[in-house]
Amino acid sequence: MIVMDYHLIELCRAGDSSAIEHFVQTYQQDVYRLALSILDDSSEADDAAQESLLAALRALDSFHGASSLKTWLFSITVNICRTRLQTQKRRERLRQILGGILQVTRTPSAEESTIENESGQAIWRAIHGMDEKHRIPIVLRYYHDLSVAEIASILQIPEGTVHSRLNTARRQLHEVLKEGRS
């Protein structure tokens, strides 16, 4: 673990408000981007990011430095996002049952609009069309530049499984993009 991270963690554990503020400022953007890339909803991502940072601060005593602080925090974020996705699926089922009465249209945020307008628009849509088990490793690897070892740690799966899921996801992307050009 980096000495600066260790010092920051110790200050946060002691309740130092400036250290807590520094922790949040340091990791908030990365956590938000990860949540947005998983949830594809800026409001949900903002809530998930706040929840992740708060959960991490509350659980600092359980952080032992086996992985980097960022990897540990990303693990918390992925778990919170998974819970939110399950909740979204339940809500969606309820909406379908109620015949769309509860459906609400949302306006994309500026960041979402930028992502949608970039040249990778087709790739982004294809990634979000994947199931969670393949989407999350792709997002962590290519949008957050994490190593296979870090992804394995976050998802609590063997590195070989990460490699396999990445390969499967790349094949799926290739097929979807190939069909889109036809």
What do the predicted segments below correspond to?
Residues M4, R125-I136, L140-T161, E175:
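Helix-turn-helix DNA-binding module
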Residues Q86-K89, M130, R135, R170-S182:
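Short, Lys/Arg-enriched C-terminal cap helix and immediately downstream tail that follows
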Residues R33, D47-L54, S67-N79:
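Structural recognition of an alpha-helix C-terminal capping motif at a helix-to-coil junction
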Residues R13-A14, D40-D41, E51-S68, Q88:
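Sigma70-family region 2
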Residues D61-H64, S75-Q96, E116, T168:
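Arg/Lys-rich amphipathic alpha helix in sigma70-family domain 2
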Residues I2-D5, R91-G120, S147:
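Internal acidic/polar
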